[in-house]
Regions:
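Catalytic Cys-His active-site segments of thiol-dependent hydrolases/isopeptidases
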Residues: 101-123
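N-terminal capping segments
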Residues: 1-75, 81, 86, 93-95, ...
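A broad, low-specificity signal marking well-ordered, structured residues that form hydrophobic/aromatic
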Residues: 15, 109, 136
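Short, solvent-exposed coil/turn linker segments
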Residues: 78-80, 123-126
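Residues that flank catalytic or metal-binding motifs in active/ligand-binding sites
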Residues: 86, 107, 134
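Intrinsically disordered, low-complexity, charged/polar segments
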Residues: 124-145
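Short leucine-rich amphipathic alpha-helical surface patches
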Residues: 91-94, 115
Length: 145
C-alpha cells in the first residue's frame, strides 16, 4: 500500500496548482492531491466523501485543523517522526493551523505536495525552501505491515 501511495502521487508531478483543484494535468491543491491519491489506491474507506476542508486561506485566520480532522475521520492516526515511512502524510503549520499537507516519498524527507509557485512537485520536507523550519505533524493511513 505504501508503494502504491507514492507511485500514484508521482503521477501528479507537473500538474499546476489550483486552489481546490482536482484534475490531473490541469490543476490540484495540496489537500485534494492527498485525498485523490489515497482514494485512488483505496487507502481510505470505500464511499468516503470528498473533504470540504478549507477556503484555501483558512489556515491564516483559523486555529481549526480541518484537514487533520478529516484525515482522522478516514482512519488516519498520528505517529511520531521516528515512525514515518514512505506513503505517510505530513502536515505543516502555516499560519494559525496545520494548513499544508504532503505525502512522504522516502526516508530522506522528500515529499510530494502542491503549491502555487511549483504546482505538484517534489520538495525536501524539512531542510529547504517553503517547508523548512515549519512545525510538523505526521499521520499514517496504513495499519501494521
Amino acid at each position: 500500500m505504501r508503494a502504491a501511495i507514492v507511485a500514484e502521487a508521482k503521477t501528479w508531478i507537473g500538474t499546476p496548482y489550483k486552489a481546490v483543484g482536482r484534475i490531473k494535468g490541469v490543476g490540484i491543491s495540496c489537500a485534494m492531491l492527498v485525498y485523490l491519491v489515497v482514494r485512488a489506491v483505496r487507502a481510505i474507506p470505500e464511499g468516503a466523501t470528498e473533504p470540504k476542508w478549507y477556503s484555501g486561506q483558512v489556515h491564516l485566520n483559523s486555529t481549526e485543523d480541518r484537514m487533520i480532522d478529516c484525515l482522522v475521520a478516514y482512519g488516519g492516526r498520528e505517529i511520531a517522526e521516528a515512525e514515518v515511512r514512505p506513503g505517510d502524510i505530513v502536515f505543516y503549520k502555516t499560519g494559525l493551523s496545520f494548513g499544508h499537507i504532503a505525502i512522504i516519498v522516502d526516508w530522506l524527507g522528500t515529499v510530494i505536495h502542491a503549491i502555487p509557485k511549483n504546482g505538484c512537485s517534489y520538495a525536501h520536507g524539512t531542510r529547504e525552501g517553503l517547508l523548512s523550519g515549519k512545525l510538523r505533524r505526521y499521520f499514517t493511513l496504513i495499519g501494521d505491515e
